[in-house]
Amino acid sequence: MLDRSTFWPAPGLTALTGEGLAVTLLPPVPQLMVSGDLPVFCRAHGLPAPVGLLAEVTLPRHALRLARNRMLVVGDEVDHAAAGWIDGAAVTPMTGALGVVEIAGSNRMQVFARASAIDPRGQSPSAALQFAGVTAAL
């Protein structure tokens, strides 16, 4: 089979800038989708508890709660062959499957207000929401 990667080279760093705003597509970040007993999984892997909407996180490893028993772990990887049932949870590698966009600048919260129905001053236990018509985790 032909190697089609030569037809579609990886894009360079993509950024949009405006008054008080910079939106940047970041390079792929290691990610895992975890479903199951989240507290047990977090303890076994040295992760802090998953956070909800607009919560501050500690880099490089953190978890975003998406539903009662589902989270997205950022900054951690599992080999595809080793994925599956691990420490009381179903684990799926997601690196490269979900784009990571950084929205920065003094007008960043105005973008959130226009692109979603969230109250940017509030928080929610789930980081999942519709953002500009696309399912996202903030």
Where do the language-model regions lie?
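Basic, glycine/lysine-rich polyanion-binding surfaces/domains
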Residues: 1-138
